[in-house]
Amino acid sequence: MEQIMKRILVTGASGFIGSFIVSEGLQRGHQVWAGVRGSSSRKYLNEPGTQFAELDLGNPDKLRQQLRQLKEEMGGQGWDYVVHAAGATKCIKKEQFFKTNTEGTRHLVEALQAEDMVPQRFIFISSLSIFGAIREQPVRKATPDNRWIYSPILLTDTPQPNTVYGESKKQAEAYLATTKDFPYVILRPTGVYGPREKDYFLMAQSIKQHTDFAVGYKPQEITFIYVQDLVDAIYLAMDAPGVEGKAYFLSDGEIYDSRRFSDLLQQEMGDPWVLHIKAPLWFLRAICAVSGTVSGWMGKLSTLNLDKYHILSQRNWQCDIEPARRDLGYEPHWPLERGVKASVKWYKENGWL
């Protein structure tokens, strides 16, 4: 059956995830607008057919003017779908998380409503991080080695974010829940990795230096999702029936221990040996506290801060993706082995490694 061309706006299009969403839409034959700031890099938004929409999510009046002009350029129409992938994962000041992730979401929704541009569906990219460190009491599961693991986080659990980032996303979700006649769907991916991603790339750099650093001695169960699986889920969420107002966890469906990712990186990079260092949590907390404080004084972003401490120290990152399978038809196709292989290949081909 021939696919009908749709109009799609992707905010945060210059970011890691956003650029993949734009590319996928173009490959599917849709009209895609890359929502960017005036200062945003467009390095990975160079595919033929890419249209740009400069949006100031921090200025509601200017944002309305920008949407009004775009609507005129589109012949008085809006977009069929809006994917809100814009967001801040690192900020110098806590308030910036809420200004970008919470208020930016509210400004966009209110501007779309005010300009009569409410889409058929609004896809909000949230995060598993809004739940924080819950379900961290190990439970015995019938596995061949009878090991202790944790139970997955469920949609019915109460979010208890342990990071400022997670709290800002939680508040954005809470705002969406107050809207009326606004067809939104929330996607909560676990850790997203893939080509062009910079945080997990730091692990690859560490492996290249023959060092793997881990923290905490209590067992850790981790989940991942390759960027293409997330993008596929986003496009499924656009047309899935009866999912308005609902939220879904997304991962590759597998559970990994704390060494699996680094072991695969070492394997794909061909490094003969790596020194695995494991430090206590109190040591990491001290390092993150000092680093975050000093960086704040200097007005610079820090890779290590208290948010990063809570992320690295969290033991349970499992989540239940069965609702996404059932309602969206989501099925992950990128297990960690395949995803890491593709990521390392890209890093090497593009001179990152």
Where are these regions (language model features)?
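Conserved C-terminal active-site "lid" loop/helix of NAD(P)H-dependent oxidoreductases
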Residues: 227, 263, 289-296, 300-331
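N-terminal Rossmann NAD(P)H-binding glycine-rich loop of SDR-like oxidoreductase domains
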Residues: 8-28
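Substrate-positioning beta->alpha
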Residues: 167, 171-172, 197-202, 216-238, ...
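Mid/C-terminal beta-alpha module of Rossmann-like enzyme folds, strongest
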Residues: 236-303, 337, 341-344, 351-352
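NAD(P)H-binding glycine-rich loop region in Rossmannoid oxidoreductase-like domains
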Residues: 55-103, 107, 128-133
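Amphipathic terminal alpha-helices
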Residues: 319-327, 331, 335-353
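Conserved Rossmann-fold NAD(P)-dependent oxidoreductase catalytic core, especially the SDR/UDP-sugar
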Residues: 84, 106-164, 185
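Active-site Tyr-X1-5-Lys
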Residues: 160-185
